[in-house]
Structure formats: C-alpha cells, structure tokens
A protein has these predicted regions:
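Hydrophobic anchor residue at the start of the ABC signature
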Residues: 87
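ABC ATPase NBD Q-loop/coupling interface
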Residues: 14-29
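Conserved ABC ATPase signature
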Residues: 73-77, 81
Length: 161
C-alpha cells in the first residue's frame, strides 16, 4: 500500500496532495513531495556520503551520527545504522508526506527514541503528514494522533490516547 501511495507500484488508486491529484503532477515531483522509507533501505554506492545530495548535519546528529559517517563504507553499516541513515536521506529531501514502513524495527531503544523525536519534530516544523506502519503497539500509543489498523475484517480506525 505504501509503495502505491508513493507512486512506485502501478495502481488504479486516486490520491491527492493538498488538493492536487497525483495524475496532474509529474511522477518525479510527486515522489519528491511524498517520501517513502521502506522496511529495508536500498544502497547503491560504496560510501554513505554518495547517497546524500544535500547533507544536513543536524539530522545526522539527532540520529546519533558524527559527520564522519559520510565517509563510511555502506557494507560496514549495521541494519539499524542503515535504517537511521535512510531516514536522514529521506528527510534531507524535505517531503510534505512521510510514508514510513517499520522505521524503527531494527533499532535499539535509544535509537528508537531518537527516530520518534526527529520525525515528530519534523512533522511539526514542516506541517507535514505521516503514515507510519508499525507492529509496536507501545510506539503507536506514543506517536499516533489517529490509528488505523488492518485485520480480517478490513481497515478499521480507533482513537489515539
């Protein structure tokens, strides 16, 4: 579903962003405005820095990284480091909508808190929207303003506490 919303999979859905239909926007513009973070991030170059056209040191710092991380070899990154850096890469593009698929699944509690704090701050500052997919019910209670769930009956909604 997230890939379809991000216009990465062929679909017949009708989606709009601030009143503009996806079909009326060039795909590259849509994908700049609607940022997707997959459960497993993709890395195609040898060093971390090659993946960051615009480096925002404050984002890296908030996720627990020093500037030297940009010189690191991608192959040496742990799954948690890859996930946090993929989030930094996504946020550096400043999308209006975040589609996050299990963004903290590979993270320790300290890194999870950092990610939650960074994303929530980003949403407030940019007045952005977020669809955050997770199985962590305690996390849902901490971050959600609205909760949707899928079960055998389909899509449901419950109030956030």
């Amino acid at each position: 579903m997230l890939r379809s919303l991000a216009d990465l999979d062929v679909n017949q859905s009708s989606v709009n962003l601030r009143g503009v239909q996806r079909e009326r926007m060039p795909p590259t513009e849509w994908r700049r405005k609607v940022g997707y973070l997959p459960a497993e991030s993709r890395w195609w170059s040898e060093t971390v820095g090659e993946h960051f056209p615009r480096v925002q040191a404050d984002i890296l710092s908030q996720l627990g990284f020093e500037g030297e991380v940009l010189t690191w070899q991608v192959e040496r990154l742990s799954s948690g480091e890859r996930q946090r850096l993929a989030l930094a890469r996504l946020l550096s593009n400043q999308p209006q909508v975040l589609l996050l698929d299990e963004p903290t699944a590979n993270l320790d509690p300290v890194s999870t808190q950092r990610v939650e704090r960074l994303v929530m701050d980003y949403l407030r500052r940019k007045q952005a929207a977020c669809l955050w997919v997770t199985h962590a019910t305690d996390q849902i209670e901490r971050i959600a303003s609205r909760i949707f769930y899928l079960d055998r009956h389909g899509l449901g909604q419950k109030m956030a506490t």
